Regions:
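Dual-mode signal for accessory low-complexity, basic/Gly-rich regions
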Residues: 2-127
Length: 127
């Protein structure tokens, strides 16, 4: 994909000296990809399926983040063992630059209509 614009609300625009692009998003959506979650998992040789977050933080100025995560280890396209008490760390700009694939399974029970996402190069610790 190509980033065409940023979501910048009034507060952030004033703080950064930029022009406001939105008021506040009420429903965030993303164009669906071709694979469901099982298809995304099958395409991964070694990785981690994050199913939940256990606290953490993100610096809104730098984009640096650290979140506790839980989920499953993926090996050779299959879920292997459950994981917990791990951390995912990085930078939001780098994370979104490394978005590799988008699923076709958005959750409809949330104001964020975002499908499963596959990222490359995420740093995890604690396994």
């Amino acid at each position: 994909g190509i980033l065409k614009t940023y979501y910048i609300d009034t507060y952030s625009a004033n703080k950064m000296g930029m022009e406001q692009t939105i008021g506040s998003p009420s429903i965030l959506t993303m164009r669906n990809g071709d694979k469901d979650l099982d298809g995304l998992i099958a395409s991964i040789d070694k990785g981690i399926l994050v199913t939940g977050f256990n606290g953490g933080n993100c610096n809104s100025t730098t984009g640096d983040f650290s979140y506790g995560v839980e989920g499953f280890l993926i090996e050779r396209g299959k879920l292997s063992q459950p994981i917990s008490e791990m951390n995912a760390t990085g930078n939001m700009l780098s994370l979104w630059s490394n978005l590799a694939e988008v699923g076709n399974d958005p959750r409809l029970s949330s104001s964020w209509r975002i499908p499963s996402l596959l990222f490359n190069g995420v740093d995890f610790s604690g396994l």
